[in-house]
Structures are given as structure tokens and as C-alpha cells.
Amino acid sequence: MPKLKTKSGAKKRFKITGTGKVMYAQAGKRHGMIKRTTKQIRNLRGTTTLFEGDAANVKKYFLPNAR
């Protein structure tokens, strides 16, 4: 059976860390920022890790060749 291809949308959105966690950029910063507080905007910066159950599904179905 041939190897499964990685979903191209997933490889742009997720990164696998050295310990196997899945990192992603937080949503909610594209538009409509005027109604959010500075604290809300600041807390959306950077990346965060997916929950373990969601990370398992991402690695299994969308990034099958990741470690």
C-alpha cells in the first residue's frame, strides 16, 4: 500500500514539535479587532498547542508522515 499524502492545508497550519505536540496559530485576528480589548488581542499572539485528542486526529489523518 502506498504512503498517504500529507494534506497541504494541514502542513501550512500545523507544526509538530520535537516532543510530538502539535502547534498552531490562534484564530480571531483577521478582522473586527476594533471591538476587542488590547488584552484580548495580546493574548491571541503567537502559537499554542492543540489538545491531545485533537492532536492525535491531526497527526493520524492530516499529517500521516509526521513523527
Swiss-Prot record:
Any single GO CC term annotated in Swiss-Prot or TrEMBL for this entry: cytosolic large ribosomal subunit
Single biological process term from Gene Ontology: translation
UniProt entry keywords in alphabetical sequence: Ribonucleoprotein, Ribosomal protein
Domain of life according to the entry: Bacteria
Presence of the UniProt keyword Ribosomal protein in the record: yes
Cross-referenced InterPro entries: Ribosomal_bL35, Ribosomal_bL35-like, Ribosomal_bL35_CS, Ribosomal_bL35_sf
SUPFAM superfamilies associated with the record: L35p-like
Molecular function terms from GO: structural constituent of ribosome
Pfam annotation, one family: Ribosomal_L35p
PANTHER family: 54S RIBOSOMAL PROTEIN BL35M (PTHR33343), LARGE RIBOSOMAL SUBUNIT PROTEIN BL35M (PTHR33343:SF1)
Family (UniProt): Belongs to the bacterial ribosomal protein bL35 family.
Protein name: Large ribosomal subunit protein bL35
